[in-house]
From Swiss-Prot:
The keyword Transmembrane does not apply. Interacts transiently with the RNA polymerase catalytic core. This is RNA polymerase sigma factor SigA. SUPFAM superfamilies: Sigma2 domain of RNA polymerase sigma factors, Sigma3 and sigma4 domains of RNA polymerase sigma factors. A motif (Interaction with polymerase core subunit RpoC) lies at residues 163-166. The lineage of its organism: Bacteria, Bacillati, Bacillota, Bacilli, Bacillales. It comes from Halalkalibacterium halodurans (strain ATCC BAA-125 / DSM 18197 / FERM 7344 / JCM 9153 / C-125).
Length: 372
């Protein structure tokens, strides 16, 4: 599954495979792991990005959920932090968000589902423990409004409102599967944690034009926090070396992270006060000819056309096909022969005769300047 560490193992130290197996077992037992837990365990083994990505994919295949933002698996205290009042009767759309008819129908439909009382929640949770799938469905449907209320707070972060709702619904389903009413908190409070986790993870995973692995997004977020703190402490932008020292990384690694963190810029970005120019207008085309070369090329084409006009139609067309003068694709003698319905030897003779004519001083002198 993974390579052994390059450094020698100390006495009693676990191998990289043993550490990964422990993480997999823990993840299967709890259902979730955090990025902080994984990176802390694997940090001494010099795993590169590809190896880390491979392990994250393997965890996903094993059904292990990986959480963002260094959050621990939600305890009672952490879930209580999510205690927040949401107006579940407010299914209005956030300002500036355009929605189509299917979304309106969805919001109208979930508004018809009655909310649950605390007693009904406990009853459904008890039935879910006994494997009642209908109870799962009812508990989820009754909390779809909660997802919409939470999703509204993440509008404008790079994902469509409907996509935010969809991701939040995935978190709601996870909450339904893991809810334990015996721990003493309401389902809506517990579900809020999972819904936020699902939405923030989706934003990190999908909102960028160029996808960045979620564990790298976590590293970027940490780097940004360190940069802001150093900016406050130093009164200026920190250098990569200062950030590296604070994060216990090499300056080269910090520069690599900063490069990855850059957001792409559209070539259509308006430039100037009048917005009449775009960024793409100021980027050099490395493949374009210089103006002088382009002018010379056009003159050569004109002179070449004039010279070819002095040949017979058949001679001119043979040269055009043989040297790809019209479309840039050269043809073999056999291909040209099929076009004219003659043998390849006959085409060779026509070509040789046409080239001899072009070499005559009366014609070649018109092209001589372009060959020097």
């Amino acid at each position: 599954m993974a390579e052994k560490p390059l450094r020698p193992l100390a006495e009693g130290e676990l191998s990289i495979d043993q550490v990964k197996e422990q993480l997999v077992e823990l993840g299967k037992k709890r259902g979730v792991l955090t990025y902080a837990e994984i990176t802390e365990k694997l940090a001494p083994y010099d795993q590169d990005s590809d190896q880390m990505d491979e392990f994250f994919e393997y965890l996903g295949e094993q059904g292990v959920e990986i959480l963002n933002d260094n959050e621990e698996v939600p305890s009672l205290q952490q879930v209580e932090k999510e205690e927040e009042e949401f107006d579940l009767n407010d299914l209005s759309v956030p300002p500036g968000v355009k929605i189509n008819d299917p979304v309106r129908m969805y919001l109208k439909e979930i508004g018809r589902v009655p909310l649950l009382t605390a007693e009904e929640e406990i009853e459904l949770a008890t039935r879910i423990e006994q494997g009642d799938e209908e109870a799962k469905r009812r508990l989820a449907e009754a909390n779809l409004r909660l997802v919409v209320s939470i999703a509204k707070r993440y509008v404008g972060r790079g994902m469509l409102f409907l996509d935010l709702i969809q991701e939040g619904n995935m978190g709601l389903i996870k909450a339904v599967e893991k809810f334990d009413y015996n721990k003493g908190f309401k389902f809506s409070t517990y579900a809020t944690w999972w819904i936020r986790q699902a939405i923030t993870r989706a934003i990190a995973d999908q909102a960028r034009t160029i996808r960045i692995p979620v564990h790298m997004v976590e590293t970027i977020n940490k780097l940004i926090r360190v940069q802001r703190q150093l900016l406050q402490d130093l009164g200026r932008e920190p250098s990569p070396e200062e950030v590296a020292e604070e994060m216990d990384l090499t300056p080269e690694k910090v520069r690599e992270i900063l490069k990855i963190a850059q957001e792409p810029v559209s070539l259509e970005t308006p430039i100037g006060e009048e917005d009449d120019s775009h960024l793409g207008d100021f980027i050099e085309d490395q493949d374009a000819l210089a103006p002088s070369d382009a002018a010379a090329y056009e003159l050569l084409k004109e002179q070449l056309e004039d010279v070819l006009d002095t040949l017979t139609d058949r001679e001119e067309n043979v040269l055009r096909l043989r040297f790809g003068l019209d479309d840039g694709r050269t043809r073999t003698l056999e291909e040209v022969g099929k076009v004219f319905g003659v043998t390849r030897e006959r085409i060779r003779q026509i070509e040789a005769k046409a080239l001899r004519k072009l070499r005559h001083p009366s014609r070649s002198k018109r092209l001589k300047d372009f060959l020097e």
